[in-house]
Amino acid sequence: MWISMNGQLYKEEQAVVSVYDHGFLYGLGLFETFRTYAGKPFLLQEHLLRLTEGCKELGIAYEPNMERIAEQISKLLEVNELQDAYIRLSVSAGVDILGLPGGLYEQPNEIIYIKSLPPRDEAVYSQGKALQLLKLPRNTPEGLYRFKSFHYMNNILAKRELQNYRWSAGAEGLMLTEEGYLAEGIVSNLFFVKNDVICTPSLDTGILPGITRSYVLQLAEANGFSTQDGLYRWEDLLQSDEIFIVNSVQEIVPITSLYTPDGQKYLVSHGSIGPIARGLIELYKTT
């Protein structure tokens, strides 16, 4: 595959960064993942805004130009012979001394990765998937709020735990906070419906302020749905009428069963997709 590094296209085996890049040494870097539709990156402005704000917090001098990024993505689609793709835009701090940083990073590295979108499993959107409760808690944010940073060990350990549950193949893993509140999935934000109100964990839990999470809330409110964020527990999920998860690539995925770490299974909405989730999926398709 071809990728973009600092505005230039390279074959993936030719694109390298220094061993003194603080993204490699200390995990000082941020990234955004999103997809294209008809060759156009979806919600690019929102992703770049989050990326820019995070870079400011980390002292990384990076202010992306949306038109330039969109053009690079278009070139990558063309050279890789893809109509649409999964995109990862990464910004690492750049080269500095071996030691804890303190100053401004003025020469960050920008890397745009691209790969084919996973095949769309229509059965998931018509029948739903499972959500597995994990023992591993969600770690606390690195700063005042959670960055989409290179620090991904918590998610990787969660993925390893999920793979140990033989009954939950294909499921998403759900993490709680240390205090036992609902947090988020390994690669998704969580929603549930109770009494026709769409609920989602508050950002006060330390979850990622997901771009698709925000978009779905706006989409729901614009179409007359009631929404609410707050501090919720596992029992709230068990008593919910519907559950769904969201991310930028999978969009809105309905959940029709829950599993505990000891393998106990609970059906959601009698094992079928609820009307609100189904309606939001259709609305998302048409935007």
Go through the PLM ranges and name each one:
Residues 1-75, 92, 98-287:
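Helix-start/capping segments and mature chain N-termini
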Residues 78-91, 98:
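Ordered, amphipathic secondary-structure segments that act as subunit-interaction surfaces
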